[in-house]
Amino acid sequence: SQGRGGRRIEEGFSMVAEPSMGFAVGDWDFYKVVAIPIDKGQSSSQSVGIEEIWGEGPVGPLYMSVGRHPNVWGPSLKNGSLFSGQARGLDQITVGSDGTFRLPWILEKIGPTRLSVSLSRLEKDRNIPNSYLVGYRLNAKPWRSLEVGLLALVHSGGEGSPSASVWSRVLDHLIVVEPLTRLGTPERQRLAISNRFAGLDFRWRLPWETAPQIYGSLVFDDLGKPDQLDRVFGQDASYIVGMFVPHILGNDSQYMRFEYRETGIRFYAH
């Protein structure tokens, strides 16, 4: 896990052991982390539980990951706008390309590409119990020192959510930019069935050995109308810019990370 992995800070002294175990079966790897409370704090309600349990490996031309583990998107491992190592592990299924491929036609110019799709179900103690997250991510490497990513995330379903037809659900995932969803829907009913995010990120490695990496990301929460750009890039957006400096004092295990983040007041709140 990266960061706290969603672990709560308890009042008073507490101690938890987290033994982990990993093994391989053929081309598949499996991993498990169990939390065992030894000394509980004054506010603790923690009991023995599974923090992470998952397996991953190739399935034909695809690569699959199944189980509970932290989902990290983008170059900021601990502070991503949508997924990060600070959050509790999600029960999920992720399917992606096993290795890189080239897109056809002029899109070949964006270089080696990876595509992944993930489906997660949130727990019953969330704001919208038992809802679903479906994420789409495309990574490309147009130059040797530059990596870019495009992403979309759809949060829908769960207790209390509005009902919708199968076609509306499918179209809701195919079109993630809000203004376009009005095509063919005069009453804009589909806008009420989910919350959608779209964004991009990059990582630029300076062209020498053990050089710093400069990175950033921009994510929007439900894009608005063209005449609302001040709201789109202000209240509805989340920005991250940072620099990662590896090999401090020649030690591979020491590094520094400088990061700035700003999130609009409507982000996560739609």
Label every PLM stretch briefly.
Residues 1-9:
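N-terminal periplasmic/intermembrane-space "pro-region" immediately following the signal or transit peptide
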Residues 2-3, 45-46, 69-140, 149, ...:
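Surface-exposed coil loops of outer-membrane beta-barrel proteins
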Residues 11-17, 40, 46-51, 58, ...:
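Residues that define the transmembrane beta-barrel architecture of outer-membrane proteins
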Residues 19-23, 53-57, 66, 93-99, ...:
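Residues on the lipid-exposed face of transmembrane beta-strands in outer-membrane beta-barrel proteins
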Residues 23-31, 58-61, 99-114, 145, ...:
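Short loop/turn motifs that connect adjacent beta-strands in outer-membrane beta-barrel proteins
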Residues 25-29, 36-40, 59-61, 68-72, ...:
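Transmembrane beta-strands of outer-membrane beta-barrel pores
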Residues 32-33, 66, 95, 115-117, ...:
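Membrane-embedded beta-strand positions of outer-membrane beta-barrel proteins
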Residues 158-188, 199, 205, 211-213, ...:
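Extracellular/periplasmic loop regions
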